[in-house]
Curated annotation (Swiss-Prot):
Keywords: Hydrolase, Protease, Thiol protease. It comes from Methanothermobacter marburgensis (strain ATCC BAA-927 / DSM 2133 / JCM 14651 / NBRC 100331 / OCM 82 / Marburg) (Methanobacterium thermoautotrophicum). This is Uncharacterized protein MTBMA_c00490. PROSITE patterns: PEPTIDASE_C39. Residues 18-137 form the Peptidase C39 domain. GO terms for cellular component: membrane. InterPro entries: Peptidase_C39. The lineage of its organism: Archaea, Methanobacteriati, Methanobacteriota, Methanomada group, Methanobacteria. GO terms for biological process: proteolysis. Pfam families: Peptidase_C39. GO terms for molecular function: ATP binding; cysteine-type peptidase activity.
Length: 142
């Protein structure tokens, strides 16, 4: 008898959910930092990043990340260059949103989304909302 393995189905990553309609950036950054072993909260990162009711700038997220001892940089990239723990900036209509990449394959993108949790979206759909702007956060090498 095969036992259902919930961990392999859901994954072992932490997903920090956003607490407001404008805190997706700090929540996405908290997701990445916690998965890198850095203790932090969405609220702490929102304060460090200067988040307000209009949201969070990528520069603010970079400042928050570096204050937690990791390197962070904003870059432009294609979907094929996205990797695990990259924070992608997407736009649908007038709504801008940060989401964390878990995996990319030929057909789908799996995301740790601050608003919706773990989701899978077809690559062709994602290509319509992906702006090409990505925050890359990495542990600094000693």
């Amino acid at each position: 008898m095969e036992v259902f393995d919930m961990k392999s189905f859901l994954g072992d990553e932490v997903i920090v959910r956003q607490s407001s309609g404008y805190s997706c950036g700090p929540a996405a950054l908290a997701t990445v930092l916690r998965n890198l072993g850095v203790h932090c909260s969405e609220a702490e990162l929102a304060e460090l990043a200067g988040t307000d009711e209009s949201g969070t700038t990528m520069y603010g997220l970079i400042l928050a990340a570096t204050s937690k001892g990791v390197s962070a940089r904003g870059v432009r990239m294609e979907i094929s260059d996205l990797r695990r723990n990259h924070i992608a900036f997407v736009r649908y209509g007038d709504t801008a949103h940060y989401t964390v990449v878990l995996s990319v394959d030929d057909r789908n993108i799996t995301l740790a989304d601050p608003a919706m949790g773990r989701i899978r979206i077809r690559r062709d759909i994602f290509s319509k909302i992906f702006t090409g702007n990505v925050l890359v956060v990495e542990r600094e090498e000693d």
